[in-house]
Amino acid sequence: MRAVLLAAATAVVASLAGAVPPHKPKTNHPILGTWIFAVPETDCEETYYMRQDGTTLVTSGAEVAESVYEIDDEPTAKGFYRNTDRIVKDNGKPDCGGGITKIGTQVTNYIRFHPSWNMMIICRDESLDACFGPLYRLGGESS
């Protein structure tokens, strides 16, 4: 019985550890806040709540998802911030594109901010060849 309880406790701790980002963004990171993306040629909008604790809340169409993320403190020589994001919760409903995101999905993107810090684009790599956006800042972290 004791071995079963120990195994169960270990499993719970391991699952919780997976939800904690290894590196939280610095307190004045430009990613922090609420960002809006109007999906082209649709009436659909995505909202990204980028929190100081390294978690996000994203709404896209009927989808509501939560993730953990890590973003570089400083941009690369090319001006991009490397961002890794992993889905930890999802309501299983379709996003603006009709897709359903699976829990555990992880992506790495490269973010480039406008000099005003109020707009950004999200790119597949450190170039402007495959990006989406712009996303517009709505307010601070708590909004």
Residue map of PLM features:
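Positively charged n-region of N-terminal signal peptides that target proteins for export
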Residues: 1-4
